[in-house]
């Protein structure tokens, strides 16, 4: 019964992640509609997209503590409702400033969904954790894929505001249903009964640890690539490569589909091939993502196979590292600090995600897409160094624990 239950829990965490990610990851498909309706340049588009990450970065550490204190179920329910209401709020005001504000509020709620789901997986899965985290993290690209297909369809008929409202209502419904169905494993109640002061001190210890710093440096560079690809791939293919809007939308959908496959693939590889090592695969992903962006920069008048091929490479690399991050960061914190540890890591990641799109958009406005993709490729390649450093530190930590 426990084996069956843990996979039900895994499915519920996937549903929550998908519902909250529908707009967060599908926003790239709405960008052309928002830019046209509000007459925005690339830099302002980047700021709007980045406001979601800014909200997450500002409050994710606190939400991680909330997960460890109140439990994952309460946080899943409250954040699902909050993110949905924020999107409905964004749909009610046809103003750029208010759009940025409500997307920031949405980001606050979105940032808490990963610590809650990550803690649930950590508690229910004692083995095959990389695979389980990969499955849960497929909710991000699955939600993005649904958003990529659904949101522009609604926007083309009724405008981007109705698309945001539809995404918000769907988020509320699915998150509420999943939270009501979720149950913690037997014996987990005491984990959530720690004093707030001790949770705060534990989070600070994790934030200062060399292992966590190295992991988050790598993931901060990878998330920069991921958010830029999701936000600007369609615009790049249309404006620089002169692809049609249908091909550009299809490429964005391929990114999300490939990311879903990649998160499962890399999670399984880390469990079965690398023996639980999450950082060696992450170093490989940095190299593949950098190569994919160089390929994208070289595209001019691409054929459909070329455009979809580069999208698949970017999805399998730049958008497929998340399960590895969630697994290693939760393992650093352990059952008692899983939410706090994920909150620390996500704060760094969302901070990078908030900076990357507007900086990339500003660079595009000044130098064009080709140079911007080359610069981002070089930056992502730097992630190999902290990935290998984290791998060495974590292996030494495990060896010391085994010797003790």
Predicted features, each with a name:
Residues 1-3, 185-216:
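Juxtamembrane intracellular "pre-TM" segments in multi-pass secondary transporters
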Residues 102-140:
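Cytoplasmic helix-loop-helix junction between adjacent transmembrane helices
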Residues 135-184:
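Helix-loop-helix hairpin linking two adjacent transmembrane segments in secondary transporters
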Residues 276-325:
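C-terminal transmembrane helical hairpin of 12-TM major facilitator-type secondary transporters
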Residues 332-369, 376:
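A late C-terminal transmembrane helix in Major Facilitator Superfamily
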């Amino acid at each position: 019964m426990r084996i069956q239950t843990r996979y039900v829990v895994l499915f519920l965490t996937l549903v929550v992640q998908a519902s909250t990610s529908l707009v967060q990851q599908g926003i790239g498909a709405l960008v052309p509609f928002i830019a046209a309706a509000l007459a925005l340049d690339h830099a302002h588009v980047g700021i709007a997209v980045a406001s979601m990450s800014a909200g997450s970065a500002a409050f994710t550490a606190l939400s991680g503590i909330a997960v460890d204190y109140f439990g994952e179920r309460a946080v899943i329910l409250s954040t699902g409702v909050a993110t949905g209401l924020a999107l409905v709020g964004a749909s009610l005001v046809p103003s750029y400033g208010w759009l940025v504000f409500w997307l920031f509020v949405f980001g606050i709620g979105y940032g808490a969904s990963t610590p809650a789901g990550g803690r649930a997986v950590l508690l229910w899965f004692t083995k095959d954790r990389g695979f389980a985290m990969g499955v849960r993290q497929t909710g991000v690209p699955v939600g993005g894929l649904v958003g990529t297909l659904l949101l522009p369809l609604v926007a083309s008929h009724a405008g981007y505001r109705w698309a945001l409202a539809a995404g918000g209502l769907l988020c509320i419904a699915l998150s509420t249903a999943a939270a009501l169905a979720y149950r913690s494993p037997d014996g987990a109640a005491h984990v959530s009964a720690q004093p707030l002061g001790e949770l705060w001190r534990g989070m600070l210890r994790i934030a200062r640890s060399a292992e966590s710093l190295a992991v988050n440096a790598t993931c901060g560079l990878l998330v920069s690539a991921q958010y830029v690809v999701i936000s600007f791939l369609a615009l790049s293919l249309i404006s620089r490569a002169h692809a049609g809007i249908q091909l550009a939308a299809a490429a964005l959908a391929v990114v999300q589909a490939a990311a879903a496959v990649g998160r499962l693939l890399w999670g399984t590889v880390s469990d079965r091939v690398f023996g639980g090592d999450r950082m060696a695969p992450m170093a490989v992903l940095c190299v593949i993502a950098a190569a994919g962006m160089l390929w994208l920069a070289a595209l001019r008048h691409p054929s459909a196979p070329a455009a979809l091929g580069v999208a698949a490479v970017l999805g399998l690399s730049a958008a497929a590292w998340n399960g590895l991050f969630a697994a290693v960061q939760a393992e650093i914190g352990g059952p008692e600090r899983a939410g706090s540890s994920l909150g620390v890591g996500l704060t760094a990641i969302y901070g990078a995600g908030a900076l990357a799109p507007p900086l990339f958009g500003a660079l595009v406005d000044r130098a064009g897409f080709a140079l911007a993709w080359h610069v981002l490729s070089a930056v992502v390649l730097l992630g190999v160094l902290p990935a290998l450093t984290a791998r060495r530190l974590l292996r030494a930590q495990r060896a010391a624990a085994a010797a003790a």
